[in-house]
UniProtKB/Swiss-Prot annotation:
HAMAP family: ATP_synth_b_bprime. It holds the Pfam family ATP-synt_B. This is ATP synthase subunit b 1. The gene is atpF1. F-type ATPases have 2 components, F(1) - the catalytic core - and F(0) - the membrane proton channel. F(1) has five subunits: alpha(3), beta(3), gamma(1), delta(1), epsilon(1). F(0) has three main subunits: a(1), b(2) and c(10-14). The alpha and beta chains form an alternating ring which encloses part of the gamma chain. F(1) is attached to F(0) by a central stalk formed by the gamma and epsilon chains, while a peripheral stalk is formed by the delta and b chains. F(1)F(0) ATP synthase produces ATP from ADP in the presence of a proton or sodium gradient. F-type ATPases consist of two structural domains, F(1) containing the extramembraneous catalytic core and F(0) containing the membrane proton channel, linked together by a central stalk and a peripheral stalk. During catalysis, ATP synthesis in the catalytic domain of F(1) is coupled via a rotary mechanism of the central stalk subunits to proton translocation. Component of the F(0) channel, it forms part of the peripheral stalk, linking F(1) to F(0).
């Protein structure tokens, strides 16, 4: 049994482990593994912190987006109300403008009609005066004719004007 290769391998393994223990290989290996574990733990902590920050940023973005959408909807609704109000005002102003223009046109027409009637009356009076003066001057002569002519012309003018 002492000459079996398994025995010598086992003895060499034990001696190697003792030498490693004496040299501190196990301690340095454990230290390296501890450092690596600490580095991995720090990376995991950073990843967790970054994930939480990303979740906060996402929640903030969603809240701001919802707020912006509500504000946009309010702005659109206010713009529609304002547009309707402006359209109503414009319609009322246009109707008022048309009514005033119509009234102005009607008064100008009435004034033109009155002027035309006055012009026609004046022309008729002139024609009547001319006709009366022609008839009277042919039928009556002298001072009586002149007095009668002046009196009739003034009466005709008073009645026609």
């Amino acid at each position: 049994m002492f000459f079996d290769p398994e025995t010598w391998v086992a003895i060499a393994f034990v001696i190697l482990m003792v030498v490693f223990g004496y040299l501190g290989v196990f301690k340095s290996a454990m230290t390296a593994l501890d450092h690596r574990a600490a580095r991995i733990k720090a990376e995991l902590d950073d990843a967790t912190r970054l994930k939480q920050e990303a979740a906060k940023v996402l929640a903030d973005y969603k809240a701001r987006s919802a707020t912006a959408e509500r504000e946009a909807a309010d702005i659109i609704a206010n713009a529609k109300v304002e547009a309707e109000r402006i359209a109503t005002e414009a319609k009322a102003k246009m109707e008022d403008f048309v009514a005033r223009r119509t009234k102005t046109a009607e008064s100008k027409i009435a004034l033109a009609e009155a002027q035309a009637v006055a012009d026609v009356r004046a022309a008729a009076a002139e024609a009547a005066v001319q006709a009366a003066s022609t008839i009277l001057s042919q039928s009556v002569k002298g001072q009586v004719a002149d007095d009668l002519l002046a009196k009739s012309i003034s009466e005709v003018r008073q009645k026609l004007n």
